[in-house]
Amino acid sequence: ELTKWDDELLVAASPNNIVADTQWWRADWDLFLVGQCKKMGVEYSDLTDISDLREEDDGVLLWIKTERSQRRVKAGLLIDACGGRAGIGQLLSIRKKTLNSTPETFAVHGHFSGVATIPPSNSQLGTGPLPYHPEDSAIHHIIDGGWVWSLRFDHGQVSAGAVLREKNYRSIQDQSPESIWSSVVNKHDELKRLFQKAVPLYPLRKIKRVGFEMERTYGNRWIMLPSSAGFIDPLLSTGFPLTLQTIQRLAF
């Protein structure tokens, strides 16, 4: 027997928890990956700036700077994993193109503690329990001219953010990330309930333009990973799988 869930949609994409998609806590996950790479002999340089880049026939010449030293490094292949910050794009003055076929959007996001939970039943209809706890999956709140995501991790902290269409939110677009977030949350009762006691773990961040496409995505001895080459919207993002697939193709 089907139950009418009003305006809620649940998608059971994974058959069980063992093989389910995972929401990674990036600080721990990235630290784990760095540790694995170092065990394999990779030289890891933290807090490093690349001040210049020169393409050559047999590699890429980099001028790098750390807190302690400056040096020149030559790489046979340079892979850009900087995402929207466009590391190689900035060094080689490669232009970002606007995606003409999709809405122009901006975003604010951060991590929070003290976010209220979503009950495992439909609060609007007062019906029985849902087939699984909503916060075992990614939560997407659809709002006028945008959407809000909420990802709760095992330790209770929440990754949350809003993607907003510029033409719908032009009046607040240039405000601080905190002001934009408050404006969006306070306009929607459910978001206000969830975040009224939430505390950001660090200052919220703003992405001035979410969607983009780089005019060049590879060269003789360099290449951009998908998130550096272009992006549409987090709602359409595959996350790690597309990145891992690209790395696998580069390796073989």
Set out the residue ranges of the language-model regions.
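Glycine-rich, flexible loop/turn motifs
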Residues: 20, 69, 108, 213-214, ...
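Short, histidine-centered active-site or binding-site loop motifs used for metal coordination
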Residues: 15, 162-166, 228-229
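Predominantly flavin-linked oxidoreductase catalytic cores and closely associated redox partners
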Residues: 25, 35-192, 247
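Short glycine-enriched, charge-decorated loop/helix-capping segments at active-site entrances
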Residues: 18-19, 95-96, 167, 239-241
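Conserved N-terminal/central alpha/beta ligand/cofactor-binding core
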Residues: 1-52
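Acidic side chains
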Residues: 21, 30, 80-82, 136, ...
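Conserved aromatic-histidine-acidic binding/catalytic patches
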Residues: 21, 25, 138, 235-242
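FAD/FMN-dependent oxidoreductases across multiple families
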Residues: 144-148, 154, 168-252
